[in-house]
Amino acid sequence: MNKKLEALFRENVKGKVALITGASSGIGLTIAKRIAAAGAHVLLVARTQETLEEVKAAIEQQGGQASIFPCDLTDMNAIDQLSQQIMASVDHVDFLINNAGRSIRRAVHESFDRFHDFERTMQLNYFGAVRLVLNLLPHMIKRKNGQIINISSIGVLANATRFSAYVASKAALDAFSRCLSAEVLKHKISITSIYMPLVRTPMIAPTKIYKYVPTLSPEEAADLIVYAIVKRPKRIATHLGRLASITYAIAPDINNILMSIGFNLFPSSTAALGEQEKLNLLQRAYARLFPGEHW
């Protein structure tokens, strides 16, 4: 992160209020600390109160300001109560960062009797995020100011195999946000989607092969959010994400072939790799050819 961008970031967030979901670990934890260190009041949302209290204590130890709001973001009534608690605690929210998410790595042919995978992924990644937006948006409209940042996925651009439930939920939020963006433009509210590549967080830990593929660190992912806050673009993607989007737009069959090769190259479970759970040379080469992609 260059010094000029960092200075602009501090200028943009100092004295502001930022609500971050999924703030107890990974990207959410990292960006919460970063925003608090820049002088904002961070509102931390996640399921577990004890973990949130630890994050709050760490932020306050560094001189930052944080408030915690434990909430199950798959429960719509709980989100309504959360929203009421937040607006009773602070009079506005300047930044809403929809970071909380659930990912499922499972091929469609392995999901014939697992419709609940699609339901629970949509419940958190789409319905939970939309419910929170609908609750907070009237206050942003009234103030004619605000930014909503959605942590999406490179899989939305590349059509990642084995992630149909996850990608569909992120794509739904993406489509909702594109429609909303035009509606709130006159109210000076901006909406940014960040198509994150794989990030080394607890969410990807169960997939052991991801130990051996290129990923971003949570700090690098936080840099993208910092850029989003400063520049307020409609979308942010890596070079691979943009290339995947262009390829699918002008040559969808090529995109299909490349994703199919990856689908057949990588196993559905680490058990198929044996006890060492390592990638062979061909798998490593393909993973490096498409850095940050979900396989």
Curated annotation (Swiss-Prot):
MF GO annotations: oxidoreductase activity
Reaction equation(s) it catalyzes: hexadecanal + NADP(+) + CoA = hexadecanoyl-CoA + NADPH + H(+)
Keywords, alphabetical: Lipid metabolism, NADP, Oxidoreductase
Record-annotated disulphide pairs: none
Enzyme Commission number, as recorded: 1.2.1.n2
PANTHER family referenced in this protein's UniProt entry, alphabetically: DEHYDROGENASE/REDUCTASE SDR FAMILY MEMBER 7B, DEHYDROGENASE_REDUCTASE SDR FAMILY MEMBER 7B
InterPro entries listed in its UniProt record: NAD(P)-bd_dom_sf (IPR036291), Sc_DH/Rdtase_CS (IPR020904), SDR_fam (IPR002347)
Residues involved in NADP(+) binding: 21-28
Highest taxon listed in the record's lineage: Bacteria
GO cellular component: membrane
Similarity comment: Belongs to the short-chain dehydrogenases/reductases (SDR) family.
Name the UniProt record assigns to this protein: Fatty acyl-CoA reductase
Chain positions recorded as substrate binding sites: 153
Active site: 166
Gene Ontology BP annotations: lipid metabolic process
Organism placement in taxonomy: Bacteria, Pseudomonadati, Pseudomonadota, Gammaproteobacteria, Moraxellales
Stored SMART domains: PKS_KR
Purpose: Catalyzes the NADPH-dependent reduction of long chain acyl-CoA (with chain lengths of 14 to 22 carbons) to the corresponding aldehyde.
